[in-house]
């Protein structure tokens, strides 16, 4: 994306660029330098509701399907999964930063409309659930960030209310 922007002639016609990242889907395999950033991080244990008894039996992650949608694999496994997930998010954040920096270098940033959105989150062991298949906050509370062109005078804001694309 950065190479395309660097070589783009903005006087020709407007540029539409859709950038998609395969991460942070499982398996959580971030580049090592990003994982190293979280080596000593205090990673929280998953939230476990007292109603989760049917999933509470501890399972061995080595003997369970890699993409199991639920299971108690223990807090250490959950923290390590989160460490890898956070490292993937940091990797993505850096890549987005590279794209924004390139837009600025090409003097295209102020005219750019940038929309950052994710299709889902991940349960990361909360309530012994994994992946994206549940209507809990971990699956549904995702970023939706819009940076308007500077010519549009849009009042900045933030909401925790549900939003949608139309």
Question: What do the predicted segments below correspond to?
Answer:
Residues 2-165:
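Active-site-proximal cap/lid insertion segments
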